[in-house]
From Swiss-Prot:
Coiled coil: none annotated. PROSITE patterns: HTH_ARAC_FAMILY_2, RESPONSE_REGULATORY. One of its GO terms (biological process) is phosphorelay signal transduction system. Residues 152-249 form the HTH araC/xylS-type domain. This is Uncharacterized response regulatory protein SE_0165. It is found in: Cytoplasm. Keywords: Cytoplasm, DNA-binding, Phosphoprotein, Transcription, Transcription regulation, Two-component regulatory system. Residues 3-118 form the Response regulatory domain. Residues 169-190, 216-239 bind DNA. SMART domains: HTH_ARAC, REC. Disulfide bonds: none annotated. Probable member of the two-component regulatory system SE_0166/SE_0165. Phosphorylated by SE_0166. It comes from Staphylococcus epidermidis (strain ATCC 12228 / FDA PCI 1200).
Length: 251
């Protein structure tokens, strides 16, 4: 759904951010990494990410120069720095960056920022009908925490067992709550049924597998659909295109 470019000359920082942040929970499906501003600028121009996370002090092209280069592009920026330096903070303010984080990065703080960013991204106009279908299909999945205990438990069960051939009863049995209460409460808080959420989540997970060039029937099985034709039906229902059409658009 979303793309991010992580730019830092320290490998441990790049890989740490790439591997330790649960990007898919925030619907970032593609993560690019760069070792300096020159490499980052190339990736940004080529892939047009929604988010750029960049260090300030780097060889060849520093973070401030990178901000100058991308100031007219449609992306959000988070600045990283080992230095609590007012001049860098001022540069960030001048370029309207999303936030400024000191190293070592507090992952909880970064995830809070991502939560806010995702909501902003959803509010922007969609450039194509394909974009609109994508956002409409997966918007109900963006909120990851609710005020209701049972709803959160059902979401947890879905994320743990979506790849299995499960029923609503299978999902709520471990929670010890009546089926009617669980279904009613879930619909009130989330806005869609448990089955609808499960199928949308399965289709979202299938996109990552499509990018990895699995056979479509293999993907259907991996994300929990009992039949390949049901996978195709739900894919087209939510995204208004077939898996094959999606593959063509992704190339």
């Amino acid at each position: 759904m979303f793309k991010v470019v992580i730019c830092d000359d320290e490998r441990i920082i790049r890989q740490g951010l790439k591997q330790m942040i649960p990007w898919k929970e925030y619907h970032f499906t593609t993560i690019y990494t760069a070792t300096d501003g020159v490499e980052a600028l190339s990736l940004i121009r080529q892939h047009q990410p929604e988010l750029v996370i960049t260090d300030i002090r780097m060889p060849r092209k520093n973070g401030v120069d990178l901000l100058d280069d991308i100031k007219d592009l449609d992306c959000q920026v988070i600045i990283l720095s080992s230095y609590d330096d007012f001049e860098y903070m001022k540069a960030g303010i001048q370029h309207h960056v999303l936030d400024y984080l000191l190293k070592p990065v507090d992952h909880t703080q970064l995830e809070h920022i991502l939560d806010i960013l995702v909501q902003r991204l959803l509010e922007r106009p969609h450039s194509t009908n394909d974009d609109a279908a994508y956002y409409t299909a997966f918007q109900p999945l963006l909120k990851i925490d609710y005020d209701d205990y049972y709803v959160n438990q059902i979401l947890s069960q879905i994320k743990q067992h979506y790849h299995k051939k499960v029923t609503v009863l299978d999902l709520i049995n471990p929670i010890v709550v009546s089926e009617s209460y669980a279904m009613r409460t879930f619909k009130e808080h989330v806005g869609i049924t448990i089955v609808d959420y499960l199928n949308r989540y399965r289709i979202l997970k299938s996109l990552h597998l499509l990018d990895q060039h699995y056979k479509h029937y293999e993907i259907a099985e991996k994300v929990g659909f009992s039949e390949y034709k049901m996978f195709c039906y739900h894919f087209k229902k939510y995204l208004h295109m077939s898996p094959s059409d999606y593959n063509k658009l992704s190339k």
